[in-house]
Amino acid sequence: MENSRFLSCKYRSSFGSSNARRIRAKCEIPAVVYGQGNDVLHLKIKSSEFNKKFAKFTDNTVLILDDGKVERCVFVKDVAENIASKLIYHIDFYEVDKRVELEKYIPIKLVGASIGVKEGGILTVLKEQVKVRSLPLDLPEFIELDLTPVNKGDSVLLKDLVLPSNVKLAESDDNLEVVIIK
């Protein structure tokens, strides 16, 4: 498993604004984990470790919080930050069961220069994301759509998207158009 997914964490028992300031003064970030029907867990994470990885996160990035005993599969739900000072005040994580498939919208990343566009066609994007189903750790950050072979007058349907082998389309109609070149 990718090392970039792992974040070390420690449990914390002190709460409130003054305690959060003390945690941040020690170059750590207060955080909470909720979901899975469990009580809310209060954690702290090293700022340097989180900041190093944070720029690479998307809404679909699944992280593994590791306290040395238990690994928790989570998504970043919310990050409270001061944009001017680039200081992160607090993180909310949402825990999911890594053994249970889930449905999530994944962005479609367009790559390549279409033959149809080179011939003067106009590219119209009708769908920017696609609903897929997979285990959390198998979720892709994006679905790549190569436009290179698409000619003028052609369209690409949802069912034409190339998905990783462990990811399934979860849209109700796989005949919907993703892009059209007119």
Curated annotation (Swiss-Prot):
Keywords recorded for this protein, A-Z: Ribonucleoprotein, Ribosomal protein, RNA-binding, rRNA-binding
Gene Ontology BP terms: translation
Protein's name in the database: Large ribosomal subunit protein bL25
Oligomer and partners: Part of the 50S ribosomal subunit; part of the 5S rRNA/L5/L18/L25 subcomplex. Contacts the 5S rRNA. Binds to the 5S rRNA independently of L5 and L18.
Alphabetized InterPro entries for the sequence: Rbsml_bL25/Gln-tRNA_synth_N, Ribosomal_bL25/Gln-tRNA_synth, Ribosomal_bL25_b-dom, Ribosomal_bL25_C, Ribosomal_bL25_long, Ribosomal_L25_dom, Ribosomal_uL5_bac-type
UniProt xrefs under Pfam families: Ribosomal_L25p (PF01386), Ribosomal_TL5_C (PF14693)
GO cellular component: cytosolic large ribosomal subunit
GO molecular function list: 5S rRNA binding; structural constituent of ribosome
Species the sequence originates in: Borreliella afzelii (strain PKo)
Source species, domain of life: Bacteria
Family stated for the protein in its record: Belongs to the bacterial ribosomal protein bL25 family. CTC subfamily.
Function (record text): This is one of the proteins that binds to the 5S RNA in the ribosome where it forms part of the central protuberance.
SUPFAM superfamilies in UniProt: Ribosomal protein L25-like
